[in-house]
Amino acid sequence: MLFRSAQLAAQHAVSAPHHGWWRDNTIGATPQANGTTPSWAEFFRERRLRPQLALAVFRGFAALLEAPGERLLEGVEALLGSHRPQPALLHGDLWGGNWLATPDGEPVIFDPAVYYGDRETDIAMTELFGGFAPRFYQAYAAVAPMPPGAELRRELYNLYHVLNHANLFGGGYAANARRMIDRLLAELRT
């Protein structure tokens, strides 16, 4: 059974005037701040990356992540460039473990970390831990194609989830987060 990309695209078509949500929630067991902002770059930097980096420093990853993470925070606007996405209703934690099919074959998503933001974040997350079937992405792109620059943004967006996993589970994820930060900083230098 394939999670239905048309349903996800329809969910992403639901919009709001600002990025964020009316209340804070969690991403896994980690608090997730959702205060609204009109700017996607500001929201992603201040409500997603900065809190996860601060928590990583608190959890003992300062030597590995603090200085490069701060440099990356300064470059978020440059990485996003002119990308100004319409706030879309997001699942927020959409990976293969957060959907299943009912006995009659209907897909159901669960364990959301809901907010309004760039729809690309949901698609990026689906690719982080193994991904969905290729036809899912083909069908989604047929309904809602990805704009130019999505591949670079995918790395930035998935950094949030890798940092969260570092904060929840430790070591290997922190090293992976550092590699992602280094690749993104290299993009800023080009």
List the model feature ranges, each with a label:
Residues 62-79:
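Short, conserved active-site entrance elements at the starts or edges of catalytic domains
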Residues 1-63, 86-87, 116:
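A cross-family kinase active-site recognition segment
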Residues 3-6, 68, 83, 131-134, ...:
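Phosphate/dinucleotide-binding and metal-coordinating scaffold of catalytic cores
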Residues 165-190:
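ATP/Mg2+ or Mg2+-diphosphate-binding catalytic cores
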Residues 3-10, 71, 75, 135, ...:
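Alpha-helical elements of Rossmann-like donor-binding domains used by nucleotide-donor carbohydrate transfer enzymes
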Residues 12-19, 56, 80, 144, ...:
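A general structural signal marking secondary-structure boundaries and capping sites
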Residues 34-45, 54, 83-89, 96-155, ...:
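Active-site Asp-x-Gly
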Residues 156-165:
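Short helix/strand-capping connector loops at secondary-structure junctions
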